[in-house]
Amino acid sequence: MARAGGHGMGNPVNVGIAVQADWENREFISNISLNVRRLFDFLLRFEATTKSKLASLNEKLDILERKLEVLEVQVSSATTNPSVFN
Amino acid sequence: MAIPVEEAIAALSTFSLEFKSLKEHRAAHFVLLDFPNFNHLDLFSFDPNEMLNGSFQRTVSKCRRMCRGPHGLTYRGDEQPDVQGLAVLLSSERYATNSPIEYSDVAAYRLSLGEDTKAINQLNTLIQEGKEMASLLYTYRSCVKALPQLPDSMKHSQADLYLETYQVLDLEMSRLREIQRWQASAASKLAADMQRFSRPERLVNGPTITHFWSMLKLLDVLVQLDHLKNAKASIPNDFSWYKRTFTQNSVEDILQVLIVFCVESLELDFALLFPERHTLLRVLPVLVVLATSSEKESESLYKRVKMNRLLNIFKMIILKSSDGADNDWSRDIKGNMYDIVVEGFQLLSRWTGRIWEQCAWKFSRPCKEPPSDSQHGSTTFFDYEKVFLMFTTQFYWLWTLDILIDYGHLTTYMQVVRWNYTGEERRALLELIGYIKSIGLMMQRCDTLVSEALWETIHMEVQDFVQDKLDTMLRTTFRKKKDLSRILSDMRTLSADWMANTSKGDPEHNSLETEEMRQSTFYPRPVAPTAAQIHCLQFLICELVSGGNMRKPGGLFGNSGSGIPVEDLKQLETFFYKLSFFLHILDYTATIGTLTDLGFLWFREFYLESSRVIQFPIECSLPWMLVEHVTETQDAGLLESVLIPFDLYNDSAQHALTCLKQRFLYDEIEAEVDLSFDLLVEKLNEIIFTYYKSCAASTLLDSSFTYLCDDGEKYFVKPLRFDAIFKLRRVMVLGRTIDLRSLITQRMNKLFRENIDFLLERFESGDLCGVVELQQLLDILELTHQSISKFLELDSYSLMLSEMQENLSLVSYSSRISSQIWNEMQTDFLPNFILCNTTQRFVRSLKGTHHSSQRSSASTGKAYFYCGSHDLTMAYQGISGLYRDFFGIPHMFAVVKLLGSRSLPGIIRALLDHISSKITAMVPKITALQEALPKSIGLLSFDGGIAGCQKIVHEILTWEAKSEVKTEVLHDLKEIGSALYWMSLLDIVLRQIDTTQFMQSAPWLGLIPGNDGQVKHAYSDNTPFTTLLSAATNAVASSPACPNPSSFLVMAKQAEAASLLYKSNLNSGSVLEYALAFTSAALDRHYSKWSATPKTGFIDITTSKDFYRVFSGLQYSYLEESINPSRKQEMLGDSVAWAGCTIMYLLGQQQHFELFDFSYQFLNVAEVENATVSLYQYSDRNKSPNFLQGYEGILEAMRKARRLNNHVFSMLRARCPLEDKIACAIKPSGAPLHRMKFTNTVSAFETLPQRAT
């Protein structure tokens, strides 16, 4: 057997205590990291929602803008020929 | 978004999720506290339990839906359906599978694994280096082509140039040399490593399982590198190269161990991820070849591993890669979250692996000829040897997919990709990619929700094993075995979590506890074990079962020499394999990334090299082929997958940047994506436009016609859905966010304008008869616009139409259509069309120049500019073909509809001006004709009979010298008549439209028919409409519930205004009457010239100055010519009579004409003569009177003309009564009566509507 003699754990009790502490520390770490990730996740979703809402707003503004342009042209055609309306 | 509570509870009970720990709540609220308002906004709910269960419920239902179609279309807060995979991964860090601190924490567990860990780290560094070199080699492109050829003029500086070239090339060459050097050193290091760990007498712990994997992976990298380098060398050479290295050392036993490990892992399907499986498959043949370098060695190997096992593995692979779509995956997904995640990973791994294998299969079997779709013979043809060879070549190359085919011919990329996929295969591939991508996306989305559950489950599994199962084993089986129980307690020590109970910190102590107490000690903690812990656990289990000697015969868990009971062995084995699963599950995001990465489908470096081209055209690119497949088949089921291929581009770009680290590859991918996205958007627009246009055309088609039609089904449009595509505002392509919806809208607007322009151009290049077709097509377009507007925010149709008609200006009343109509009327319609009074149609005269042929032929547009589908276009062309050769009432309806009340007055005015100018132009010609007539013309004498009359008329009409003037006058009259008749048609149509409108508005205005056919107002001051609204307003205003009735008051006021407007619109005048009045006014200017006032005050029956004399002469000569068959006389139609009669009527000469017209007198003479002759020949009736012979034709023509004239006169009397026209008359007593008024008799033409007086 390869690990005969002094190759085993030096002091199992010490190792056991360290492992126990390690578990507890890691619980804390994973809690924090998970919640950071959740925060990040939320931000991503928030961005997606905002983006699509802004896009739909932009769409509506676009339509209005184009309509306004057409109306402006119509009005300008009238104001340049005031004689027609007298 | 919010999930009902019942559903959440159902989900909870179904999956028995225990997520009620206080920590959980705190953790979720930690997020909540910062964004309290968003809860209110309902962006998404954030209650942890509901969120978890809700989204889990969704996950499961998604999974279920997945079984039906490639996309579970669910909508999130942003209302975008998921038709795309993960565009980008947040992190691809593997902190569990690869130890981030290089296993430096292993030492803490005091297992004397220092040597082993060092070796692992060394191998891992080598693997990393090797991968970088492999990507360098793979992306290496010959730079010789880029070097300039030496021109003759620069011969003198030859040496310098060569030096420069050398320096450029030297850099590349040195890299290659470096690779070679590295390869040699790495191989020898690997060999040394193997040698070190294959000596059982050396007191070194290991090798561990992680070490095995590192060895295998390094070997894999080396093999790949070597193959990339010597792309054309045959395989045995490569093997021999390794053999030299490895046979110098005695490593056979470790090779055998590795082979056993490979075979067992494959057989037990122990590799969760397909790349691992492929690594095993690639390395295994190499190992086998290496291990069987001599007879003796192979014997010893086959003693341990039966040849059949190897063959079975290879055979299984080959057959698997050839089978088609797999339906097995659709089984119900049950079990808890962990199981689902594992299952999800397994599915993803299986699918993606299958795509790799299928792809390799395709690459190894290029299509010989483009048209033939026949597959190569099935694999059963191959004998085992060949299968083995096949397998090695195939999987040798899987990593790069550039499979070298040594079948004796060079294959091109075209053959392996472009022509190699049938439609079915493309569809299957697309669907499978869809499944992979959407499941991956779904799993990634619930990452933060499930990770705690996963950690807890893994924690529980580990703790259950080390605290419970190991304890049982310690107390029973291993009680007597000191060494083995030491290993077991080591396992407990390094991984057990005794949860805050310090008294149980001592495992020895704990092992003596009673079972009941032990059960209560551990409860789950959402923390996963580290990589090092798992590494050590695996090592210890191996040690345990092998008794420290791996080289024993039999498998890892197959030997019974260790003296461990079978059930314990079983438990250990299960746990051992579970451990390797845990790592991948802990690397949740990275695992999903690996499993859904399909970027390899784009890469083609090997074929670029062998084809000696810079890049392949886009048609050869697999992602684009899939996009093309969707757009071409227009399969309703596939349309939503159209963006899936862009995920492939995302993947391959990611791969190019992060793995291969080559900028130029990314640039190439980017260029291709730019191109293909543009093409996709364009095609998508065409498909959408065509679809809605076909629908509109199909709706507008007469349904009773399609019902009766034998093949009416072809006029129905197969339904398609674009909802998902219309909602895509954020398409992720290469890290950019694209608003697909706005792109589609933009292009759709453009498409509508183009279509209108096309239709107008088409109308402009045809004649006036095309107006019905134009109106039909514009109607279809409008309906198309309506149906698309339900989904997209398009520009308003009327604004687009007036923009394209150049009709936007408020002061312009003309438009493209109206100017075209007028232009056509002036140049083509009035001169070239002749009227048929009976059919109420204008038709093109035979001699009228067909000037449409002179115009530029209409450009043939795409099908979607007409009616969408071909069948519908043909149907509509058939319908419009009926209207192409005449102009009548339907055309007038189209004209009125197209021009509307805005441009129509312009046309009317232009037409009236045309009439007036024609009359003015006619005056000198008429005068010339008048001058040619004798001063005085008497009545025709009855004495000479018909022949005599004809002679007299001929004597009177001495116009031979002026035949040109005569023709011109006839043409002028024809144009005036046509214009007038056009007006009457317009009048009919407008009347009809007015009547419809009247019928619709009458009930609202309170109009009722009176006794005498007149319209009466039922109410004196207000109408039912205003009464209704004012009553409603009063009711609302008086109610206390309405705080602000002002809008209702406004509405009531508006109603009054509307009813006034409608009332004033009731008695619209008649266009025809106006036209007649206008003509009359125009004639008044020439009254003196065309109407001689009798000096005596009586009718001057002999005068030749009146207009009717000229018209009479013209009519007579025209009739005479029209019956003469020898002279091809131009037909002028009925409009001449319309013009002549109108002018005469308006000049007050109707009765003169009816009395003194030559033709009428001629008819009278013929009648008298006929009567006399028949009186004489009553006994011989059957004998036709020969004196009339030769005159039937002209008599008939004259009768016709008289009938026509009478018709026109009666119409005129009805529409334009001449009450204030004054003439003289003689009373029956003989006394003259000056200045008497005409009395108008009731019209015989009663069908015309009466003028309302």
From Swiss-Prot, chain A:
Gene Ontology biological process terms, A to Z: actin filament organization; cell motility; regulation of actin polymerization or depolymerization; trichome morphogenesis
Coiled-coil region list: 47-81
Keywords: Coiled coil, Cytoplasm, Cytoskeleton
GO cellular component labels: cytoskeleton; plasma membrane; SCAR complex
GO molecular function, one term: identical protein binding
PANTHER family (alphabetical): PROTEIN BRICK1
Function, in words: Involved in regulation of actin and microtubule organization. Part of a WAVE complex that activates the Arp2/3 complex.
Protein family (similarity comment): Belongs to the BRK1 family.
Name the UniProt record assigns to this protein: Probable protein BRICK1
Organism of origin: Oryza sativa subsp. japonica
Species lineage: Eukaryota, Viridiplantae, Streptophyta, Embryophyta, Tracheophyta
